UniProtKB/Swiss-Prot annotation:
Transit peptide in keyword set: yes
Keywords: Mitochondrion, Transit peptide
Name used for this protein in its record: Altered inheritance of mitochondria protein 24, mitochondrial
TM region(s), chain numbering: none
Database matches in SUPFAM superfamilies: TRAP-like
One of the GO biological process terms: inner mitochondrial membrane organization
Family: Belongs to the AIM24 family.
Record-linked Pfam families: AIM24
Subcellular location: Mitochondrion
One GO CC term on file: mitochondrial inner membrane
InterPro entries referenced in this protein's UniProt entry, alphabetically: AIM24, AIM24_sf, Trp_RNA-bd_attenuator-like_dom
């Protein structure tokens, strides 16, 4: 893999330094630009004139597939200087109505003795350099943080034919963008980011589809043919493993009081009919469940197991340790007030009182010039000697 012109700042990959050149505008995702600074051995120490604009990338397709217009908005930054650099961080949060409502509820509940905070998983960055020999499929709404705008680098949405392929990534198959050409790209993912190199065609790997950030390939046909959906052997016996009909309801269906066999009440008859109808409905639901699971398994889409895929080499795969789209937010509690009143009162530490004779000294100068020191509690004795 080529060395990128984008430099990671720090060891935790939370920020990147991007070069700004007059001939190459830099596209940075909205909200991710941290600062612009001057650098270099021959720099003047001042940032040159900066021009900032905006650009929409795959607006309509991203709006339909990611249900987000913000994922397509990028700031275009140009400069007249040669040694300016921009600092970029993946400052993107998962905004959604249900998450906003949850944060509102949490803010109300946090008025008690425990503070509750909701945080998204930590995001990291990964610089990528394209040399024109490999295309990259980048999955996720918020994965493209920055890229240089040149005549070669191009970002396109996933084609509909690739999205509908039987061996594609199923529900994740259409939620990616294709990066082609030559240039530098900055990716962002959740958790830590790692790259896996498959050296030849005999190498393969099974990965959870939700952890895939990007996959390289020589064209879309070659890339999608190398991805096999649900590589595990699925047992159809799992389809018959359905919760049994409630035994209590079955007993109700056979309920009949021997003492009142000749005079069953209307309520008892209603209970029997309701139990029989419930049993019939349950059997129908079980039948539909079995047929649905078996049909799904036979067509390569296992709805009862995690969405794993097998990817064949040779290619490079970039993965993230946390899920990009389905990772639930974590709720953590932190004590912001002591639990008891006793804990709220700090312990009083008594400082030992120093004795007076430990710091009051009496000095006597003799006629021969010698000086003697004597510790006394007070000067009463000395005064009495003199007077």
């Amino acid at each position: 893999m080529l060395k990128s012109r984008f430099k990671v700042v720090g060891k935790e990959a939370l920020m990147a330094s991007l070069p700004l050149e007059p001939s190459v505008p830099m596209c940075i995702r909205k909200g991710c630009l941290v600062s612009v600074m001057a650098g270099g051995a021959h720099g003047s120490g001042k940032t040159a004139s900066l021009v900032i604009g905006h650009k929409w990338v795959n607006f309509w397709t991203n709006l339909a597939r990611f249900r987000s217009w913000n994922s397509s908005l990028y700031h275009v930054l140009t400069t007249s200087g040669k040694e300016n650099r921009a600092l970029v961080a993946p400052n993107i949060s998962r905004g959604s109505p249900w998450l906003s409502a949850l944060k509102l509820v949490v803010s109300i509940l946090s008025k008690n003795s425990k503070g509750i905070t909701i945080t998204d998983p930590q995001r990291s960055i990964y610089p990528l350099e394209l040399d024109g020999t490999q295309d990259w499929n980048v999955w996720g709404r918020d994965s493209l943080i920055a890229f240089e705008q040149n005549d070669s680098l191009d970002i396109k949405p996933a084609s509909l034919s690739s999205s509908l392929k039987r061996d594609a990534l199923f529900s994740h198959s259409h939620k990616y963008q294709v990066v082609t050409g030559r240039g530098s790209v900055l990716l962002g993912g959740y958790g830590d980011i790692y790259s896996i190199d498959l050296k030849n065609s005999t190498d393969d790997i099974v990965i959870n589809a939700q952890n895939i950030l990007a996959v390289s390939g020589k064209g879309q046909t070659e890339t999608m043919n190398a991805i096999e959906n649900n590589p595990f052997i699925i047992s159809h016996t799992a389809a018959s493993n359905i919760p049994e009909f409630t035994s209590n309801v079955q007993e109700l269906a056979a309920f009949e009081d021997p003492k009142q066999q000749q005079s069953q009440t209307i309520v008892q008859k209603t209970v029997k009919e309701a139990a029989r109808a419930s049993k019939a409905v349950w059997h129908w639901i079980s039948y539909v469940y079995k047929k649905t699971v078996i049909f799904s398994n036979n067509n390569g889409h296992n709805i009862t197991s995690p969405a794993f895929v097998k990817i064949k080499g040779p290619r490079t795969i970039i993965i993230q340790t946390s899920h990009e789209t389905t990772q639930p937010v974590s709720v953590s509690t932190v004590d912001i007030l002591p639990r008891t009143v006793e804990n709220a009162i700090p312990e009083v530490v008594e400082t030992p009182k120093a004795k007076s004779d430990s710091y009051i000294n009496y000095a006597t100068v003799q006629p021969d010039g010698n000086v003697t020191f004597r510790s006394v509690s007070n000067f009463n004795e000395t005064i009495a000697e003199r007077y």
